[in-house]
A protein has these predicted regions:
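N-terminal DNA-binding module of tyrosine recombinases/phage integrases
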Residues: 1-47
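N-terminal core-binding DNA-recognition domain of tyrosine recombinases/integrases
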Residues: 27-37, 47-135, 151-154
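Short, charged phosphate-coordinating catalytic segments
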Residues: 110-119, 170-191
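Long, amphipathic, Lys/Arg-enriched alpha-helical "connector/arm" segment
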Residues: 131-161
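Active-site/catalytic core of tyrosine-dependent DNA strand-transfer enzymes
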Residues: 145, 210-278
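Short, basic (Lys/Arg/His-rich) helix/loop patches that form interaction surfaces
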Residues: 155-158, 256, 265-297
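C-terminal catalytic core of tyrosine-transesterase DNA break-rejoin enzymes
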Residues: 168, 172, 176-179, 287-297
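Conserved tyrosine-mediated DNA breakage-rejoining catalytic core shared by Y-recombinases
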Residues: 183-225, 235-236
Length: 297
């Protein structure tokens, strides 16, 4: 009997993988599959639990991480100390963020169970928060939406005009997600229609361009002749990159989109304070409002 066989027969303990290296492999696979939103979320989940363990590079053996007690400690740490993305925000993560990170870990755990790395414990995540906390109602009332539609954009501060225009276009384009608006190409406009592929599903969509949307498109379209995009949302340094002989990769474009999304939502908050005090505006609101008003029409 070989030494290796003898160790297996005697039940020699198998070295457990480290969570950081394992999750990094998962993230790389998600990026290879172009599931960038999931890869982005997993990356932040990994940064969070690494911070809980003392910072990047600290060992995180999976058999220690995936225990009810350790997961509960991590949850309590996130509630108390988890760092916000914005520096000025207080410590402590929202319930939705805690749930997202825990559900990411749960998915990683199930992947390890499927690969026989860890045994299955059906109650492992029973004592930690994995629900999705319902947020403040996202859909606007008809009167509130009409307030935005009837706003004279010229009376807004210059940095807010295009933000409200994009929000209105998302609504007028049948609740188009911000990511699809950002990735719209000039060639997607076919007369009075837009034909494009959903970024999330790849499904081809066709939307009619209402008169109000056509006017907004003319005013806020991308005026860079070298850009393929309909609106100047992605990579404002596009022409500079081309002159330097550089072409942005998909991942870089997605990071540009995330930066644009953060700025978009921050400015929507300012618009809400000016036009709809007490109402929360975000990129999701246009989509939810269109769906709600269309349903009740």
């Amino acid at each position: 009997m070989s030494k290796k066989e003898k160790n297996v027969e005697m039940g020699s303990p198998m070295k457990m993988p480290d969570l950081a290296s394992y999750m990094q492999t998962v993230i790389e696979q998600l990026e290879a599959d172009k599931k960038r939103s999931a890869a982005h979320t997993y990356t932040y989940a990994l940064k969070s639990i690494a911070e809980f363990y003392g910072g990047a590079g600290m060992p995180m053996p999976v058999d220690e991480v995936f225990t009810p007690g350790r997961l509960k400690e991590y949850e309590e740490w996130m509630r108390r100390e988890g760092m916000r993305k914005r520096k000025r925000e207080p410590k402590g993560l929202s319930l939705n963020t805690i749930s997202t990170y825990m559900r990411n870990l749960k998915a990683v755990y199930h992947r390890m169970v499927g690969e026989k790395v860890l045994p299955y414990n059906p109650k492992l995540f029973d004592d930690v928060y994995t629900k999705v906390e319902s947020q403040t109602k996202r859909a606007l009332e008809l009167e509130q939406m009409n307030t935005l539609l009837c706003t004279d954009l010229r009376k807004l501060p210059s940095d807010l005009r295009c933000v409200l225009a994009y929000f209105l276009l998302m609504f007028l384009f049948r609740g188009m997600p911000f990511i699809d608006l950002a990735y719209l190409r000039k060639q997607d406009v076919k007369g009075n229609r837009i034909v494009y592929s959903r970024h999330k599903t790849g499904r081809q969509m066709t939307v009619r361009i209402p008169k109000e949307a056509m006017e907004l498109m003319k005013e806020f379209k991308n005026r860079n002749p070298d850009s393929i995009y309909l609106f100047p949302i992605l990579h404002k340094q596009e022409s500079k990159k081309k002159r330097a002989g550089k072409v942005k990769k998909d991942k870089e474009l997605y990071m540009d989109y995330l930066r644009a999304l953060r700025g978009f939502n921050l400015k929507l908050e300012k618009i809400a304070s000016l036009l709809l005090p007490g109402v929360k505006l975000s990129s999701y609101v246009a989509r939810h409002t269109w769906a709600t008003l269309a349903f009740h029409a």
